[in-house]
A protein has these predicted regions:
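Short, hydrophobic alpha-helical segments
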Residues: 195, 300, 332-340, 476-480, ...
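Cysteine-nucleophile active-site neighborhood
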Residues: 87-91, 423-526, 596, 602-614, ...
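Flexible phosphate-sensing "switch/lid" loops adjacent to ATP/NTP-binding sites
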Residues: 46, 51-429, 435-437, 444-450, ...
């Protein structure tokens, strides 16, 4: 009886699904008397509706909004700005009051970006759930003010790992597991599943999922994903699938002729794989000629109204505004059959214009190990930008390779050594970001020592905190051989030690990762005021080593206070130096949670101290004003000035 009931439920659900998808019932009941079915149609439809709803069929609501997908691909060369383009699409749709989520597809075989060198693929961006992802997820989070998960970054490694696990579990029922259909199905299922995860703190799924396909069309690594997307457009329906292709229109020769052939070939490769672009976003150094636009429309089979010209801009906050000027939002919404709504971009426009208009400079020396590639510290750069705008200052970053500050560098290349120290000495503030390994550590300690002794505002992040502690232990506490066991396992004064829960054999995903709580130990510290007098804050971590708890008492007696600790009270999270304008370091990475409208408090502290405005910002009255105004405070310094609480800095 139970088997018969189960079969009946499956039959009713399949019949109803066919009806909902507007397929003829005859496609299911072939050979049946059509006259009988037509005469009983109304009664039968009502019967199926009631049964399906009672059985909990998800399709019983015809009003359910289907997920919309915008896919962003790229051609000709890498590094065209697909991530910024995808993020800008998200900004436009969010400004139209649609809920947006993002997915990034990376065709590399690595499971995630956690074991990659910054020189190889830029920074590793850490998410709240501990996912180590591509830096583009940072762009998505910053632009759209959302919080993604590790599953929002799809890699070839993750897909094949999942498929192989299913095969080992016998989930494929003895079939030969192949790229098509098993890998492509896994990709489609992954996209569809993750697209429905809410990322904006609200309940229910988002309205639109923006999927960026990493790499370049034509790369062999991308082929399974392109095939999966080709199938996916039919799975979700053409009215729910929009493809934006980003391509390069180079200028060749002294006459400045704009060439369309590379884009034509890119579109040809895309179409041969079964995908046709809805919109073409052309990157160029200057505005495209009208004749060039017409030629692209003709040869690429794209409507002239759907060709965007994304020129080089002074800051990336202009990109969504440029796309809106060219009515890109209307083209996307129209194709997806979504209702156009007024855009709320006033704050975004204000921010883009303010970055270009502020003129009072503030220079920050960033002493790093991977300064040869700007993307290695992308989130640090963005966090500095967010804070400089809020502080009404024109940011100037002085990049310093840590090794160039070391004495050994002076012997090898004295010019580099002198140049590095000249940069450090003219900086208004010093920032030492995270890193791994022993290379450049002594140079970072030189920067920390210089900032400490000369009362220069200093912010240390992760390794930047550890080198500050080691330097203090050496030069203030008198332990000349103090070091980290990462660099010197035999040191008699280990100021920094390996965390007991870490793994020394498996590198991927074995660090202390993701959002962790930091609890303030005292209210007599600048960090507590910067965070708005909160008792605890949640910030993202990525580290294997920590400050040695056995040395904390001695360090604090000498003036280095650990004002923030983890929930157990045994792991040091924030330290501050007494009797210093601003010497703060944290074990976590505050740059990962900085947003254009909500700068990281730690970065705000550095910029404010470097520009002589910290006292005004952290006074009791100013902190209470900031707490009361909350997100309404677009420009904190101007608001503090308007309230008559400003006491420092000059314009």
């Amino acid at each position: 009886m139970r088997l018969r009931e189960k079969k009946t439920r499956v039959l009713l659900f399949r019949v109803y699904t066919i009806r909902v998808e507007q397929l003829p019932l005859s496609s299911f009941f072939e050979g049946k008397n059509s006259k009988f079915w037509n005469s009983s149609y109304i009664l039968f439809e009502l019967f199926v509706r009631v049964c399906c709803c009672r059985l909990g069929a998800s399709s019983c609501s015809n009003d359910e909004q289907k997920m919309k997908y915008v896919v962003v691909s790229g051609g000709v060369v890498s590094g065209l700005g697909k991530g910024v383009t995808a993020s800008s699409v998200g900004v436009m749709l969010s400004a139209a009051d649609y809920r947006v989520t993002h997915i990034k597809i990376d065709p590399y075989i690595n499971v995630d970006a956690g074991t990659m060198s910054p020189f190889e693929h830029g920074e590793t961006y850490v998410l709240d759930d501990g996912g180590e992802s591509d830096l583009d997820l940072g762009n998505y989070e910053r632009f759209c003010d959302i919080n993604l998960t590790r599953d929002h970054n799809i890699t070839t490694g993750k897909v094949y790992q999942s498929v192989i696990e299913r095969e080992r579990e016998g989930k494929y029922l003895g079939k030969t597991v192949q790229v098509i259909p098993h890998v492509t199905d896994e990709i489609q299922d992954w996209i569809e599943r993750v697209a429905h995860i809410p990322v904006d703190g609200k309940e229910g799924p988002p309205d639109v999922c923006i999927v960026e396909l990493g790499g370049t069309v034509g790369d062999i690594e991308s082929m399974p994903f392109i095939e999966a997307l080709r199938q996916f457009q039919f799975r979700v329906g053409p009215e729910n699938f929009c493809l934006v292709h980003v391509s390069l229109v180079p200028v060749v020769g002294s006459v400045g002729e704009q060439k369309t052939k590379p884009t034509q070939h890119s579109i040809q490769a895309l179409r041969s794989a079964g995908l046709a672009p809805t919109m073409l976003a052309c990157r160029s150094s200057s505005a495209l000629d009208k004749a060039v636009m017409e030629k692209l429309a003709l040869f690429c089979h794209v409507s002239p109204n759907n060709i965007l010209n994304l020129i080089d801009v002074s800051n990336i906050w202009h990109v969504p505004l440029i796309m809106v000027e060219q009515k890109a939002h209307l083209a996307i919404l129209g194709h997806l059959q979504m209702k156009p709504r007024p855009l709320k971009l006033e704050a975004w426009k204000h921010r883009a214009e303010k970055w270009d208009s502020v003129h009072v400079p503030c220079s920050i020396a960033v002493v790093g190990k991977y300064t040869g590639l700007g993307d290695s510290y992308l989130s640090v750069t963005k966090a500095l930008m967010h804070s400089s705008i809020a502080c009404d200052r024109k940011l100037k970053i002085l990049w310093i390779e840590a090794e160039d500050l070391e004495e050994e560098s002076k012997q090898a290349n004295e010019d580099k050594y002198d140049e590095a120290w000249a940069k450090l000495k003219r900086a208004d503030g010093v920032l030492v970001p995270g890193g791994f390994g022993g290379r450049g550590v002594e140079g970072k300690m030189c920067a920390a020592k210089y900032a400490r002794e000369n009362e220069i505002p200093y912010l240390g992040i992760c390794l930047g905190m550890q080198v500050a502690v080691i330097e203090f232990a050496r030069n203030v506490c008198g332990h000349a051989d103090a070091h980290s066991t990462e660099m010197d396992p035999t040191t008699e004064h280990p100021a920094v030690i390996f965390m007991p829960e870490g793994s020394k054999t498996h590198m991927g995903g074995t660090m202390r990762l993701g959002a962790r709580e930091t609890i303030f130990q005292t209210k007599e510290c600048v960090s507590w005021r910067l965070y708005g007098k909160k008792d605890a804050v949640a910030e993202r971590h990525r580290h294997r080593y920590e400050v040695n708890p056995e040395m904390v008492d001695e360090l604090e007696q000498k003036g280095l206070h650990f004002v923030g600790k983890d929930e157990t009270g045994t792991r040091m999270e924030i330290c501050e130096l007494a009797n210093h304008p601003f010497f703060v370091a944290c074990q976590y990475h505050p740059e990962f949670k900085s947003r254009p409208g909500r700068p990281s408090p730690m970065f705000m502290g550095l910029l404010l101290a470097a520009s002589g405005q910290l006292e005004s910002y952290v006074s009791d009255e100013a902190v209470e004003l900031r707490i009361s105004m909350g997100n309404m405070m677009r420009s904190p310094i101007k608001s503090i000035k308007a309230a008559g609480l400003y006491v420092g800095g000059t314009d």
